[in-house]
């Protein structure tokens, strides 16, 4: 498994824990990785994301199959069912069926409640190098690989101009948000994909803002508060089913407040 050799080697050469939580961003290959682990351990890969329920868990306890049961938290949340399924998942990781292994998949630890997380061995995917990502798709501007930081994101990536425009939008916000009124600030929603599929995702926007503010902070420490604020909002954006429009608007208003004072 290119880019995850150390983690892969550790998992295929030792006994698998009964309950596992894999943390890796979109496009890092969690499903393919787990399938390969299952093949090496001669376990049937069974994705129960769509079917997880108390009734299913009860059925698994009387099954004699030797399986790896997989639950994708992000996929489950997109159907607004994660909260209703937490108790079933908790029961499964607390007492996994005999001869079976549980794999919970998520993008960030914050997406998994503590009672589930605390009962799993947590495995984190390593970051991919820019050199490796360049082999998948070449961009002349290395900054783009900070935004598209997994193979899957790079494969889905569009033309370079799209990202150059995003850098320009973020630069303009940083330089001008202090003199914008509330109406001007909220008008920036037009760049996002809340109502426009061609717009930028909230994750991509925050990733870009954090990167650019960090670069500015290295040259001018007055940007530290803006960088810290952005880091906080990056974490908030990882919450499942968050109201992205509300989060985006609040971020810009708080950012304006920081630069108003400086």
Placement of each model-derived feature along the sequence:
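Conserved alpha-helical scaffold flanking the Walker A/P-loop in AAA+ ATPase domains
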Residues: 9-13, 51-93
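Short beta->alpha connector loops
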Residues: 49-53, 106-109
């Amino acid at each position: 498994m290119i880019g995850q050799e150390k983690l892969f080697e550790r998992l295929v050469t030792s006994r698998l824990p009964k309950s596992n939580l894999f943390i890796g961003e979109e496009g890092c290959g969690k499903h393919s990785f787990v399938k390969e682990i299952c093949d090496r351990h001669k376990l049937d890969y069974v994705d129960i994301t769509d079917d997880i329920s108390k009734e299913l868990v009860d059925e698994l306890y009387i099954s004699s199959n030797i399986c790896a049961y997989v639950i994708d938290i992000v996929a489950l949340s997109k159907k607004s069912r994660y909260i209703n399924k937490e108790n079933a998942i908790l029961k499964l990781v607390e007492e996994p069926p005999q001869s079976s292994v549980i794999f919970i998949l998520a993008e960030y630890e914050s997406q998994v409640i503590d009672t589930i997380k605390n009962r799993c061995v947590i495995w984190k995917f390593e970051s991919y190098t820019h050199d490796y990502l360049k082999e998948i798709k070449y961009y002349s501007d290395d900054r783009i690989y900070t935004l598209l930081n997994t193979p899957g994101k790079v494969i889905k990536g569009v033309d370079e101009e799209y990202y150059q425009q995003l850098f320009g939008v973020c630069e303009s916000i940083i330089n001008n948000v202090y003199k914008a009124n509330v109406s001007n600030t909220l008008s920036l929603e037009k760049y996002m994909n809340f109502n426009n599929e061609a717009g930028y995702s909230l994750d991509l926007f925050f990733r870009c803002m954090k990167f650019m503010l960090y670069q500015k902070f290295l040259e001018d420490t007055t940007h530290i508060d803006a960088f810290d604020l952005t880091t906080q909002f990056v974490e908030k954006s990882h919450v499942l089913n968050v109201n992205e429009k509300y989060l985006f608007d609040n971020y810009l208003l708080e950012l304006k407040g920081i630069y108003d004072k400086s």
